[in-house]
Amino acid sequence: MAAPATEHVRNIVLVGQDGAGKTSLAEAMLHVSGKTPRMGTTHDGKSYLDYDEEEIRRHFTLGTSIAPIPYKDYKINLLDTSGQADFLGDTLATMQAAEMAMFVVDAVDGPQVMTTRLWHEAEAMRLCRCVFINHIDREHANFDVAMATLHARFGSRLGAVTIPMGVDKDFKGVIDVLRMKARYFEGEDERVEEIPEDYLDVAQVARDKLCDLVAEADEDLMMKYLDGEEQLTQKELEQLLDKAIAQEIFIPVFVGSTIIKQGIKGLMEDIASYFPHPRAHGPFYLANGNELYVDETGEPAGFVFKTLSDPYVGRMSFIKVLSGYLEPGMELANARSKKKERLSHLYVMMGKEPMDVKSAKAGDIIVVPKMNDTKTGDTLSLSGDIEVDPLPSPIPLYPIALEAENKKDEDKLGTFLSKQAEIDPTLRLIRYEETHQQVVFTMGDMHVDVLLNKLKNQAKIEAHLVPVRIPYRETIQKTAEAEGRHKKQTGGSGQFGDCWLRLSPNPGEGYVFASEVVGGRIPKNLIPAVDKGVQEAMAEGYLAGYPMVDINCVVFDGSYHAVDSNEMAFKTAARLAFRAACQQADPIILEPMADMDITVGEAYAGAVMGDISTRRGRIVGTDSNDEGETIIVVRVPYAEVLSYTKDLRALSRGSGAYSVRLNGYEPAPYDVQKKLVEQYEASRK
């Protein structure tokens, strides 16, 4: 495939709820264009795009696949994305590489939760949008209801470019409202005829609506049109359509059935003729505040919107060419790492199959292998000075901890997780020193399940989930004094240390050590040993093995032996004194607290607030946003919201979102402390 000119490239990202038929639409377009000898399907595991073992097993898309389709003189890059919330990060990153987001909506189910969320994301990106109403031949399909729902949800700018002739089992073709023709797809061929008489009225109504919306792209023409002075001619309508779409004045709606390939060829014609090309779209925003428009004549540069690891090829970087052109052998600089990367090969991906290309011009999408210092969100350019400001990835909030079945695989497990985190921005690794545990933050149960299967099938590591340890802490509530005396005689030189400690609470100020020893009761050179012994005892905890914090410690008296006193003896004495004082100082366990902002539809707010109360949380306040959603601000023990990602989805039917940040510690309730102490004591037996 020769490198197409920028004006002849169309980058379309397919988005929407899982099951609406995004992959089927891409497969239908591939087949209708002649790119594939048969139409791939997900249900039998023979999709060209859903080729991953996990995708075949689950029958839906887990990550972005690319389908490059040659159509006439154009190249249509279809970016097929996941409709699962757990893989939202990959979908959002891919949307940055497109000029048009095509929302695939089921004719029966209508727009679902993920459709709505991605619609608002596309709107925020200033990404052009269109809709394909799929499965119009499905039982109980209703085009009018689907359109009404779309208008109610997304506004009045949506207008039908094609409408169905019949629905459900009576569906036989589509009416092309733009050209006022009827289209029938029979076998491998399409037949275009005049509109049947019984559909002329409904076609004219749709045509008038189309003209009303598109006319707004030209102010002078719109005034004449609205005043009734003249109607839009076919030529005027076609000339204004691409402008109206690019300026988001008009959002086209198409209809069809991917399974029987109805409505597909006309859709492809309109994509080529009227959808925005990369240069006509808005700019990329750079980290330095400047803007960069896609331009064939500019400095060679590309933006990495996806990274994956292939077991045979290695790391593969999916790149949107921003300016100039790229070709094998080029050496580009990474704006983030400042390292040079050589473009060994340029591929165009067809599902999992790489196809070598000699060059790629601005606006096109390619894949480059083996750029090991480059990751998702990076920008590469000849100078290294161009850096796109990427959209932030969704923050993973669902924590898990993993252990290898075989202890010998622990290092391999850590290495694999680190590499996965490099290519997947929604996978975050944090090691908590308080618990000596590495926690993997994910997007949800499905994300975890896929990760475990990759461990098993790709890395050949068997691993299992273990409970995430909460970073509890311990402290004291009263002032107390105690002596620690260590004396040991073993026949030679012995050990002797004796010190008195005063412990007092020091809320929020951490650990402070001081000496009030006078008269040489403890030599000055052994005072640091007392400090070390106290810190070692604090690290071990007193009640349940959690580190102790916020304690003011004063050593004020003691005694020593000229021969037997040494650093080890006074460290031991300090530990004994510290534990004896803690016993009198009313020790408690502190639990980490989380501040959360929970955003849900008003209908779910009551259930969410009730649920937070059962988690020992406090409602701090409520607010609302521009979408009419309720924002609930809460403070809750972190231990109670480890699984909140999936819990909120259940409470809000998948529509809720939240942020969480650890913010301080508070005394744990008695029953929580009792349970933690019992667990600790049982583990020591």
What are these language model-derived features?
Residues 1-685:
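Structural and coupling elements of P-loop NTPases
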